[in-house]
């Protein structure tokens, strides 16, 4: 899937082709071959929540996407539901909150800050940094998807989150602290247009039906392990760095 919001604002076309046409192509293939299908999606299809709102996203929350990326994912979710109902495709859907951990593309928020600091560049924080994300370690996400594939009910949607709400300012300050810098040693840059304020997942359906539970519940230690991974695996991300930063620089970010 195409999954980076900033890229969808620069050029929405690949998101339509990959996330919508790509999902249609896969659905037709599984319909033809009569195989089980699991569709991985995002909590961004639900739009956003107010910072002081106690509510969380639930499987029944109405869709309200706000970007080309989230709109393309919402459309792909609806295609899956239609193929289940219209053609009897055996499929499930999961909508997950923000991931972190090893092997994440360095255009993403956390690895970008880590690799900038490795390069001696101050982290960049969009706007005031008040936007809240519900962080989950990628290995917990993987475990949840496997549980859904093995035990999930056909046609159902499961929300994946680990109760890891933190605003972007808190995350940047923790990265700085863990990497030996003053917690205020970052730059404020222009905010993303239409930047969603808060995401939060109600994972009770996943927990109660399938017995899933996150293993990486300490964000600080998970983030430290992630920092260590990027330090130890520069050969993996280094070839991507210049191009990623050039794209951000063109937008003043």
What are these model-predicted stretches?
Residues 20-28, 107, 139-142, 146:
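Conserved active-site region of classical short-chain dehydrogenase/reductase
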Residues 117-253:
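C-terminal substrate-binding subdomain of Rossmann-fold SDR/epimerase-dehydratase oxidoreductases
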Residues 26, 80, 113, 206-207:
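Structural element of the ATP-grasp superfamily
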Residues 52-53, 106-114:
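A glycine/serine/threonine-rich, flexible loop-to-helix segment
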Residues 75, 79, 83, 113, ...:
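Hydrophobic alpha-helix immediately C-terminal to the catalytic Tyr-X-X-X-Lys motif of short-chain
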Residues 1-99, 225, 229-233, 239-253:
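N-terminal Rossmann-like NAD(P)+-binding domain of SDR-like oxidoreductases, especially those catalyzing
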Residues 65-72, 96, 102, 106-110, ...:
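The catalytic Tyr-centered alpha-helix of NAD(P)H-dependent dehydrogenases
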């Amino acid at each position: 899937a195409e999954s980076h919001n900033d890229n969808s604002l620069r050029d929405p076309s690949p998101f339509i082709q990959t996330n919508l046409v790509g999902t249609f192509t896969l659905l037709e293939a599984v319909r033809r071959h009569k195989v089980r299908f699991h569709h991985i999606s995002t909590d961004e299809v639900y739009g956003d929540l107010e910072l002081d709102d106690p509510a969380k996203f639930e499987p029944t929350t109405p869709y309200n996407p706000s970007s080309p990326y989230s709109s393309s994912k919402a459309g792909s979710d609806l295609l899956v539901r239609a193929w289940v109902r219209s053609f009897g495709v055996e499929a499930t859907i999961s909508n997950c909150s923000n991931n972190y951990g090893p092997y994440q593309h360095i255009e993403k928020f956390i690895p970008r800050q880590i690799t900038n600091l490795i390069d001696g560049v101050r982290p960049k924080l969009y706007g005031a940094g008040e936007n809240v994300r519900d962080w989950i370690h990628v290995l917990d996400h993987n475990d949840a998807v496997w549980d859904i594939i093995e035990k999930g009910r056909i046609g159902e949607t499961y929300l994946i989150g680990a109760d890891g709400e933190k605003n972007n300012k808190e995350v940047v300050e923790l990265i700085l602290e863990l990497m030996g810098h003053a917690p205020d040693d970052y730059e404020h840059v222009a905010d993303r247009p239409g930047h969603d304020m808060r995401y939060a997942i109600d994972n009770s359906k996943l927990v109660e039906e399938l017995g899933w539970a996150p293993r990486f519940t300490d964000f600080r230690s998970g983030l430290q392990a992630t920092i260590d991974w990027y330090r130890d695996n520069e050969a993996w991300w280094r070839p991507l760095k210049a191009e990623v930063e050039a794209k951000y620089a063109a937008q003043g970010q």
